[in-house]
Amino acid sequence: MALLITSKCTNCDMCLPECPNEAISIGDEIYVIDPILCTECVGHYDTPTCQKVCPITNCIKPDPEHQETEEQLWERFVMIHHSDKL
C-alpha cells in the first residue's frame, strides 16, 4: 500500500529528497505522497526511506485507502522505472 504523511508533519524537508520515485511533494500545509508513484521503496530499498529519515515517530504510515500487495508495488516499480523495456 502507498504511504501517507500525517498531520504530525513539521515540513522538515527530510523526506522529500529521499524518495526514489519522486512521490513526495509539498502540499497545502504538509508534505504529501502521491499514491500512484509510491511503491514503499519496493525495488529500491528494504524499508521506505521516507520513514527512516523522518524525525517524527509515526508521521509516515500506511495509507488505508491504498492497500496493495508487494506484487502490485513491484509492478508499479517496473512501470515507473522500466516501462521503456517492456
Swiss-Prot record:
[4Fe-4S] cluster 2 binds at residues 19, 38, 41, 50. InterPro entries: 4Fe4S_Fe-S-bd (IPR017896), 4Fe4S_Fe_S_CS (IPR017900), YfhL-like (IPR047927). [4Fe-4S] cluster 1 binds at residues 9, 12, 15, 54. It comes from the Bacteria. Residues 1-29, 31-65 form the 4Fe-4S ferredoxin-type domain. Pfam families: Fer4. SUPFAM superfamilies: 4Fe-4S ferredoxins. GO terms for cellular component: cytoplasm. Its cofactor is [4Fe-4S] cluster. Keywords: 4Fe-4S, Electron transport, Iron, Iron-sulfur, Metal-binding, Repeat, Transport. Binds 2 [4Fe-4S] cluster. One of its GO terms (molecular function) is 4 iron, 4 sulfur cluster binding. This is Uncharacterized ferredoxin-like protein HI_0527. The lineage of its organism: Bacteria, Pseudomonadati, Pseudomonadota, Gammaproteobacteria, Pasteurellales.
